[in-house]
């Protein structure tokens, strides 16, 4: 069933839901650039004001996946994405990127989907470039990277070219819209497992149920109650877990895993170079908060990837990957592998 853009806008004004097929139609218009900037801006703002439903987000993510340049991965076992929505305003170093190296070193395959920093001082793309990684790979090269190194970085603009049709509107609006939460839902490699950090407590239950509708296997959506879009050391973390088709919501604390609750203040960085230094320090097994929060998040990712039986088991595997030097070696391995494709 189709709906006109004007009807959709009226629906948002009346705080009524746009149904699945209607949302598919609208989103395709946006992704093809067939809506005027005024209409596109009005609809995505209207959705934000009325609050997007699980069904609307799932439909939008379905279309964004349709328009993506996909990465074909042959073996889906222990395959995980570690990603945050960003926008948490914490300005910490790239914890999920550091966790990628540890998670891969401990036996998972990681497809990291990311971009340059917008709200943060250093996005995943920025810190990977600072480390010497070539982020500008084609889809087949990313697939080769995952097969060879256990890691692949998908630079969002290379995989979502249709997003250029809404980029100017989003930039001019300058407020969060549905597109801020679609990125983590649209991994171009289709990783069935995921550790996803979100910027608001309400999104925990929403995003995990969107992933349920999209057919994901094992997903942990997390929100640190100190405002972090990661598993936090500074507060309890809300978790929405999808496993075997069922959703469970619960809370975890650093002390549950023998970790001390400490402030995340020392994790703040001003730029990608500072983030690089902190990331390498953690992977070099330097004692401190950076190493502990990477261990905690990598351990959670290893549980999501089904490499570990529990978060606690995952943390133990993460500790071993760091202490053995395997996690640090993964950085050099990814740099070497991706540099051969330098154009």
Swiss-Prot record:
GO biological process: L-tryptophan biosynthetic process
Catalysis: reaction(s): N-(5-phospho-beta-D-ribosyl)anthranilate + diphosphate = 5-phospho-alpha-D-ribose 1-diphosphate + anthranilate
A GO MF term: magnesium ion binding
UniProt cofactor(s): Mg(2+)
Residues where Mg(2+) 2 binds: 229-230
Annotated residues for binding of anthranilate 2: 170
GO cellular component: cytosol
E.C. designation(s): 2.4.2.18
InterPro entries reported in the protein's UniProt record: Anthranilate_Pribosyl_Tfrase, Glycosyl_Trfase_fam3, Glycosyl_Trfase_fam3_N_dom, Glycosyl_Trfase_fam3_N_dom_sf, Nuc_phospho_transferase
Pathway annotation from the record: Amino-acid biosynthesis; L-tryptophan biosynthesis; L-tryptophan from chorismate: step 2/5
Keywords, comma-separated and alphabetical: Amino-acid biosynthesis, Aromatic amino acid biosynthesis, Glycosyltransferase, Magnesium, Metal-binding, Transferase, Tryptophan biosynthesis
Keyword Amino-acid biosynthesis: yes
UniProt binding sites for anthranilate 1: 84, 115
Transcription regulation keyword on record: no
Binding site for 5-phospho-alpha-D-ribose 1-diphosphate: 84, 87-88, 92, 94-97, 112-120, 124
UniProt cross-references to HAMAP family, sorted A to Z: TrpD (MF_00211)
Subunit structure of this chain's protein: Homodimer.
Function: Catalyzes the transfer of the phosphoribosyl group of 5-phosphorylribose-1-pyrophosphate (PRPP) to anthranilate to yield N-(5'-phosphoribosyl)-anthranilate (PRA).
Protein name: Anthranilate phosphoribosyltransferase
Organism of origin: Burkholderia cenocepacia (strain ATCC BAA-245 / DSM 16553 / LMG 16656 / NCTC 13227 / J2315 / CF5610) (Burkholderia cepacia (strain J2315))
Gene (name only): trpD
């Amino acid at each position: 069933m189709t709906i006109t853009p004007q009807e959709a806008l009226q629906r948002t004004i009346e705080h009524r839901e746009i149904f699945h097929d209607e949302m598919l139609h609208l989103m395709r218009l946006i992704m093809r650039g067939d809506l005027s900037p005024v209409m596109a801006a009005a609809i995505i703002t209207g959705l934000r004001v009325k609050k997007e439903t699980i069904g609307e987000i799932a439909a939008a993510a379905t279309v964004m996946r349709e328009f993506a340049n996909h990465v074909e991965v042959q073996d889906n076992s222990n395959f995980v994405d570690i990603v945050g929505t960003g926008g948490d305003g914490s300005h910490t170093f790239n914890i999920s990127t550091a966790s990628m190296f540890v998670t891969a070193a401990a036996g998972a395959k990681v497809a990291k989907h990311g971009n340059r920093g917008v709200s943060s001082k250093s996005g995943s793309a920025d810190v990977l470039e600072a480390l010497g990684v070539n982020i500008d790979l084609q889809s087949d090269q990313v697939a080769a990277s995952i097969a060879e190194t256990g890691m692949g970085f998908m630079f969002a603009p290379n995989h979502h070219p249709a997003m250029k049709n809404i980029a100017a509107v989003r930039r001019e609006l300058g407020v969060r819209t549905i597109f801020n939460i679609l990125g983590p839902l649209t991994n171009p490699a289709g990783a069935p497992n995921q550790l996803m950090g979100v910027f608001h407590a309400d999104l925990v239950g929403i995003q995990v149920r969107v992933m349920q509708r999209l057919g994901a296997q094992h997903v942990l959506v997390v929100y640190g109650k100190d405002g972090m879009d990661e598993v936090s050391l500074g507060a309890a973390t809300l978790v929405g877990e999808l496993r075997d088709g069922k959703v469970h919501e619960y809370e975890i604390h650093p002390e549950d895993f023998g970790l001390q609750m400490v402030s995340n203040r020392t994790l703040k960085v001003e730029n990608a170079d500072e983030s690089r230094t902190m990331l390498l320090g953690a992977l070099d097994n330097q004692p401190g908060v950076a190493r502990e929060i990477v261990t905690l998040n990598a351990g959670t990712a290893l549980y999501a990837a089904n490499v570990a039986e529990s978060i606690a088991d995952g943390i133990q595997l993460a500790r071993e990957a760091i202490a053995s030097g395997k996690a640090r070696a993964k950085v050099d391995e990814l740099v070497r592998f991706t540099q051969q494709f330098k154009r």
